[in-house]
Amino acid sequence: MTNFEPKKFKNIWTIEDSISSYNIDKWGDKYFSINSKGNISVTKDIKSENKIDLFKLVKELKSREINPPLIIRFNDILKDRINALHDSFLKAIKTYKYKNIYQGVFPVKCNQQKNVLEKIIEFGSQWNFGLEVGSKSELLIGLALLENQNSLLICNGYKDKKYIEIATLARKLGKNPIIVIEQRDEVKRIIQAVQELKATPLIGIRAKLSSKSSGRWGKSIGDNSKFGLSIPEIMLTIKELKEANLINEMKLLHFHIGSQISDIAVIKDALQEASQIYVELCKLGAPMQYIDVGGGLGIDFDGTKTSSNTSTNYSLQNYANDVIATIKDSCELNNIKHPTIISESGRAIISHCSVLIFNVLGTSHVSSKLQIFDKKNQQLIISNLLDTFYELKKLKNKKINLSQIIELWNDAKKFKEDCLVAFRLGFLSLAERAYAEELTWACAKEISNNLNNDEINHPDLSEITETLASTYYANLSIFKSIPDSWAINQIFPIVPIHRHLEEPFCKGNFADLTCDSDGKLNNFIDNGKIKSLLNLHKPEEDKDYLIGIFMTGAYQEALGNLHNLFGSTNVVHIDINQDNSYKVRNIIKEDSKSEILQLLDYSSASLVESIRINTESAIDQKKLTIEEARKLMDQIEISLRKSSYLSE
């Protein structure tokens, strides 16, 4: 019997090795690091020394029966992101002597959770931070939550008569809704609402820019973009507003160049075009006050600071500087008063504060043991595989001849294919096929254990790592908790939240609980590169192996679905105290199975009664005892009250 142990790369593994391997110091933005115990630590804000141990926090939450999978939201990080955004604009305003202010709004679509929006409004109150809404439902949220009469409520999206009427009348409540015209037919509805309600709204226009964008959301800009008015349509709209005596309510120009813009050059081009449109609107007689630069402010998911889809080649300060400088230059060249600048920076505000934690349920991997059988009793094609295995074993501890190893690996693959053909034709038994596969894995392991990282990544050998990789079964639904990973291949930082004093010598990916082949995580950040496997530890028996998915605060909860009827996870809001302790502010309990079924119009009582009738019939037919029936019904009723996720 031959045993194959996992390959260890270093004699001593350090915290610095883990930080480098998972690129934590790059994407973590100083909010996340590793403490002396080898656990992920979370910092109150980027200027603070106050930290808590994430692994310890999760263990203590478990003692309260708040179990993974769960979302942990750090209020202090959310506050710090809002502060950082405003501080960057304040610094840019001072540097460029800009003669107006920055006033941000948060796009509700990024995260509609009540506790989140309340905190954003609270933390941004000193700057009159507002909200951006894109539907009537979101409009109602904005009207209910925004109490600061100096805050703005930017009204985007498709607008029917009722939407416009609500926004128009809300102005009489002391609110500041600005109805942004995004479709030509909205002009007629606004004019009609003014005539019927005897009230006037604040009005804005969204422009379709011709500047080219980039990345996944590049089509948000251009002549064929979903929203906005072309230049001829803007001219016609201004004419109609003048004729309706509404030009004095025209206050805002809005544009949007897409989400997660990775290249600052794209932002600069759009700003130059939009600034000139703003200037021309002023010249046409509109008493403009605001320019809303929309969203697009990206974050560095992978820590590479490049223009890839998962990164940005600019900082928060670079962004603010370019916004302020470009708008100032255009206005001053035309003797136009500097406008108040608005941005709808959702992802940059909300992403960092949320961490999704899940536990690993188990693993699957190729067999670590090989039973050696006598060659005399083997068929020729299996004997060939066995010879290849012995040839590879002879190379152990010898000077590496890479071309020889590549040749032997190609032989092993060819012999395995021959075995598969023989099996299909009925010449090999199932046991013989199994032995052939084990021999192939054994060849791969011999090669892996004899080569360094650079050698094993040779194009002719790179598949060996994939062959030997483990699948880690995750107690979560990708479709519910991180749908962007499935839908658009978004890369999120994924890191074990403990055991960083140990070398993660396993290579693996994750499979979720759903019965769907797309329910896998197989794109990871590794030393700043995107790879299909992650460095992981071997789970310890009867101990949790806990993984964190970071920067998940934007869009994921809103977009998540009920695939296989896995519902919402536990959500916990945490404040970090000055003494490095924490306070649990809010707990939003996970969906029970009963609650999930109710969403689909299934009554738990009816389901239970239907099953009870079946058990009575089974008792009558002596297929089930009364005791078995009672136990079955008890388990069903208990299960309906419990989580849709797996428990211990």
Swiss-Prot record:
<dbReference type="InterPro" id="IPR022653">
    <property type="entry name" value="De-COase2_pyr-phos_BS"/>
</dbReference>
<comment type="function">
    <text>Catalyzes the biosynthesis of agmatine from arginine.</text>
</comment>
<dbReference type="GO" id="GO:0046872">
    <property type="term" value="F:metal ion binding"/>
</dbReference>
<keyword id="KW-0745">Spermidine biosynthesis</keyword>
<feature type="binding site">
    <location>
        <begin position="291"/>
        <end position="301"/>
    </location>
    <ligand>
        <name>substrate</name>
    </ligand>
</feature>
<dbReference type="InterPro" id="IPR041128">
    <property type="entry name" value="Arg_decarbox_C"/>
</dbReference>
<keyword id="KW-0456">Lyase</keyword>
<protein>
    <recommendedName>
        <fullName>Biosynthetic arginine decarboxylase</fullName>
        <ecNumber>4.1.1.19</ecNumber>
    </recommendedName>
</protein>
<dbReference type="InterPro" id="IPR009006">
    <property type="entry name" value="Ala_racemase/Decarboxylase_C"/>
</dbReference>
<dbReference type="InterPro" id="IPR040634">
    <property type="entry name" value="Arg_decarb_HB"/>
</dbReference>
<dbReference type="Pfam" id="PF02784">
    <property type="entry name" value="Orn_Arg_deC_N"/>
</dbReference>
<dbReference type="Pfam" id="PF17944">
    <property type="entry name" value="Arg_decarbox_C"/>
</dbReference>
<feature type="modified residue" description="N6-(pyridoxal phosphate)lysine">
    <location>
        <position position="109"/>
    </location>
</feature>
<dbReference type="Pfam" id="PF17810">
    <property type="entry name" value="Arg_decarb_HB"/>
</dbReference>
<keyword id="KW-0479">Metal-binding</keyword>
<dbReference type="GO" id="GO:0008792">
    <property type="term" value="F:arginine decarboxylase activity"/>
</dbReference>
<keyword id="KW-0210">Decarboxylase</keyword>
<comment type="similarity">
    <text>Belongs to the Orn/Lys/Arg decarboxylase class-II family. SpeA subfamily.</text>
</comment>
<dbReference type="InterPro" id="IPR022657">
    <property type="entry name" value="De-COase2_CS"/>
</dbReference>
<keyword id="KW-0620">Polyamine biosynthesis</keyword>
<dbReference type="GO" id="GO:0008295">
    <property type="term" value="P:spermidine biosynthetic process"/>
</dbReference>
<dbReference type="InterPro" id="IPR002985">
    <property type="entry name" value="Arg_decrbxlase"/>
</dbReference>
<dbReference type="InterPro" id="IPR000183">
    <property type="entry name" value="Orn/DAP/Arg_de-COase"/>
</dbReference>
<dbReference type="InterPro" id="IPR022644">
    <property type="entry name" value="De-COase2_N"/>
</dbReference>
<keyword id="KW-0460">Magnesium</keyword>
<keyword id="KW-0663">Pyridoxal phosphate</keyword>
<comment type="pathway">
    <text>Amine and polyamine biosynthesis; agmatine biosynthesis; agmatine from L-arginine: step 1/1.</text>
</comment>
<dbReference type="InterPro" id="IPR029066">
    <property type="entry name" value="PLP-binding_barrel"/>
</dbReference>
<dbReference type="GO" id="GO:0006527">
    <property type="term" value="P:arginine catabolic process"/>
</dbReference>
